[in-house]
Amino acid sequence: MRKFFGTDGIRGKVGAGKMTPELALKLGWAAGRVLSRSGTKKVIIGKDTRISGYLFESAMEAGLSAAGLNVMLMGPMPTPAVAYLTRTFRAEAGVVISASHNPYYDNGIKFFSNDGSKLDDEVELEIERELDKPLTCVESHLLGKVSRIDDAPGRYIEYCKGNFPAEHTLHGLKIVVDCAHGATYHIAPSVFRELGAEVIAIGDKPDGLNINHEVGATSMGKIRETVIGENADLGIALDGDGDRIMMVNRHGKVIDGDEILYILAYDAQSRGVLRGGVVGTLMSNLGLDLALQELDIPFDRSNVGDRYVMTMMKEKGWRIGGENSGHILNLDHGTTGDGIVAGILVLAAMRRRNATLEELTENIKMLPQVLVNVRFEGAHNPLESEQVLAAKSEVEALLGERGRVLLRKSGTEPLIRVMVEGDVEADVIKHANYIADAVRNLV
């Protein structure tokens, strides 16, 4: 049974619960104890732009050093950059200090293994077992040293650009790039400019407190307004740590992760490089499933969370997968979700087919889907109550084969997520609220 790690590392409000300086220190030490048993004894740490990142960086650094591991600090860098540089520096692991799309007052800690993928569940459980032990320190001559990777941004910018075909440029495209005042603020605009695009950057002025605030992949109003107001060709919105992407076409319509998966799968199929099918999640829109069926591309669903998408992709030997929230995995172009690289791959598909973003998505029709989040912090599970199960069954009977209902607990926040999709938006909204009310009655 996990005490600390959720579906995406450890996350919570700074100074409360799990996310304290004391835990970060102990976590660094415990992880160092596990990771020092083999390998290079070298760990990379990156973070996003929230103000508490400095605090947790120092604590993790001290804990890892106390366990005898050398630490390399990247400063503010996107999560996928940590995964990439962990591989290229042959480090034993990478550490990301970020709460992704959450507000500034939250933070989190997650790990990458030496191949740039998320740590296995077994390794996380081993770290948790070490956390129960008293903290000790190696002999002074065995303490880890700390250094900085000063050229980390340049290394990652070149890596991102390398995913765009050399025979094409982005010359003539006007792109709005929303960095969510997060870890991509000094990376993403440069990547797309150097590939030839005219870039209008927003959300690129972090102050430690404004990460994800009314900007980024979870708040699309600003980028939609900017794309339309600037007469741009498209917009690319990233989240606070840069592992998620949402897009906007020239008319201001949001293009979500499901539609991006469709574009990438169709492009790979047309070039004869698609291996297998596409992995989505239980939250993926039924419209993606139906559109891929038209292309004879297999589709399967994993549990929600990019680590579970990755697990299913590896089991099936498939190369493309992701979530409608914008985590996009393409194992031919990286080991984890990468918002910038996913955007580059969509732009590459546009250039290869000489098509607009609207044209690339014209054959996928998304069904109306409503997600209602209900805050729930009780000890019992409302999803097992007769009242909620009865409401779910009632709605499923009304929707028939042209709709779905999904109820689940969030793995990162104290929320029950109620998702309903079907043909008629008004009915979908009504059904989702009906089930959500059944959950609220138990709070």
Curated annotation (Swiss-Prot):
Q: Which residues bind Mg(2+)?
A: 100, 239, 241, 243
Q: Which UniProt keywords apply?
A: Isomerase, Magnesium, Metal-binding, Phosphoprotein
Top class in the EC scheme: isomerase
Enzymatic reactions: alpha-D-glucosamine 1-phosphate = D-glucosamine 6-phosphate
Question: Which EC number(s) does UniProt give?
Answer: 5.4.2.10
Q: Per the annotation, how and in what number is the cofactor bound?
A: Binds 1 Mg(2+) ion per subunit.
Q: Which residues form the active site?
A: 100
Keyword Isomerase assigned: yes
Q: Which InterPro entries match?
A: A-D-PHexomutase_a/b/a-I, A-D-PHexomutase_a/b/a-I/II/III, A-D-PHexomutase_a/b/a-II, A-D-PHexomutase_a/b/a-III, A-D-PHexomutase_C, A-D-PHexomutase_C_sf, A-D-PHexomutase_CS, Alpha-D-phosphohexomutase_SF
GO cellular component entries: cytosol
Cofactors (names): Mg(2+)
State if Hydrolase is listed as a keyword.
no
* GO biological process entries: carbohydrate metabolic process; peptidoglycan biosynthetic process; UDP-N-acetylglucosamine biosynthetic process
The molecular function terms of the Gene Ontology recorded here are: magnesium ion binding; phosphoglucosamine mutase activity; phosphomannomutase activity
PTM summary from the entry reads: Activated by phosphorylation.
CDD domains found in the cross-reference section: GlmM
Phosphoserine: modified positions: 100
Q: What does this protein do?
A: Catalyzes the conversion of glucosamine-6-phosphate to glucosamine-1-phosphate.
**What is the similarity comment for this entry?**
Belongs to the phosphohexose mutase family.
Protein name (record):
Phosphoglucosamine mutase
> What is the primary gene name for this protein?
glmM
